[in-house]
Amino acid sequence: MSNWLVDKLIPSIMRSEVKKSSVPEGLWHKCPSCEAVLYRPELEKTLDVCPKCNHHMRIGARARIDIFLDAEGRAELGADLEPVDRLKFRDGKKYKDRLTGAQKQTGEKDALISMSGTLMGMPIVVSAFEFSFMGGSMGAIVGERFVRAANYALEHRCPMVCFSASGGARMQEALISLMQMAKTSAVLARLREEGIPFISVLTDPVYGGVSASLAMLGDVIVGEPKALIGFAGPRVIEQTVREKLPEGFQRSEFLLEHGAIDLIISRGELRPRLARLLAQMTGQDTPEQAREAAAVA
């Protein structure tokens, strides 16, 4: 073996391999919209919103609750509930195996997390869908956790906010999943009768049985920028009606323009703007008014 190969080439290759392995995995993230390569710690500061094109990336349910609620005084509702394969359903794979896989992947028992806490000092209860868990599909446990959150709002007379991100009813639970549409709609009717505010925040994507029930029943319906919202997907609709759909069809901006939702709020503005809105809806001081009153006192 030549001296050049031993002294120069091999050490150079080894240094290159060491350098590659020293870069932590997940340190960089490519924006799916503009394809900008973003430094992960900087992206976290913008709440997973691309600083180049303002694309709102999908985030997990716990991350969403973490950036929305105050840090202190949180309590999870229905955390002990776990899904059961009552129908022994099987398509290409057993439902119980799909559940096990989703639980390992996400660290969650099912696709909805409900939590009580405060929003800028205001008592509140929040539910958030975990889209990574079987597409955020709604089955019996998702429905029950949502109902428990709504019952908490009824008992404590505090507002409720739900962040939806779902493909719809869970196919593997058949009629049990469809029943959750009626179950969640019924408890929201009770909130409305009692005059307790419910704000629905639609994030990318919201489809199927979730969009046909709880997601569109808010006293105020908010969309994140460019979120996909609908019942069936655009391609399915185009194939059915045999027509080309308008530009931006089913995006939150299109729905706002046509009166289907009330507001579009960027992720970084959700916390202060919903706090002000809920304060007005409940007759409480806004966070700004509370600070002014405390300063005067």
Curated annotation (Swiss-Prot):
Binding site for Zn(2+): 31, 34, 50, 53
Catalytic activity of the protein: N(6)-carboxybiotinyl-L-lysyl-[protein] + acetyl-CoA = N(6)-biotinyl-L-lysyl-[protein] + malonyl-CoA
Cofactor(s) for this UniProt protein: Zn(2+)
GO molecular function: acetyl-CoA carboxylase activity; ATP binding; carboxyl- or carbamoyltransferase activity; zinc ion binding
EC number: 2.1.3.15
SUPFAM superfamilies: ClpP/crotonase
Sequence ranges assigned to domain CoA carboxyltransferase N-terminal in this UniProt record: 27-296
Assembly information from the UniProt record: Acetyl-CoA carboxylase is a heterohexamer composed of biotin carboxyl carrier protein (AccB), biotin carboxylase (AccC) and two subunits each of ACCase subunit alpha (AccA) and ACCase subunit beta (AccD).
Stated role: Component of the acetyl coenzyme A carboxylase (ACC) complex. Biotin carboxylase (BC) catalyzes the carboxylation of biotin on its carrier protein (BCCP) and then the CO(2) group is transferred by the transcarboxylase to acetyl-CoA to form malonyl-CoA.
Cofactor note: Binds 1 zinc ion per subunit.
Family affiliation: Belongs to the AccD/PCCB family.
PANTHER family: ACETYL-COENZYME A CARBOXYLASE CARBOXYL TRANSFERASE SUBUNIT BETA, CHLOROPLASTIC
C4-type zinc finger segments: 31-53
S-S pairs: none
Gene Ontology annotations of biological process type: fatty acid biosynthetic process; malonyl-CoA biosynthetic process
Any one GO cellular component localisation term in the record: acetate CoA-transferase complex
Keyword Iron annotated: no
PROSITE patterns, sorted: COA_CT_NTER
Keyword DNA damage: no
Pfam families according to UniProt: Carboxyl_trans (PF01039), Zn_ribbon_ACC (PF17848)
Localisation per UniProt entry: Cytoplasm
Keywords: ATP-binding, Cytoplasm, Fatty acid biosynthesis, Fatty acid metabolism, Lipid biosynthesis, Lipid metabolism, Metal-binding, Nucleotide-binding, Transferase, Zinc, Zinc-finger
UniProt name for this protein: Acetyl-coenzyme A carboxylase carboxyl transferase subunit beta
Pathway: Lipid metabolism; malonyl-CoA biosynthesis; malonyl-CoA from acetyl-CoA: step 1/1
Main location: cytoplasm
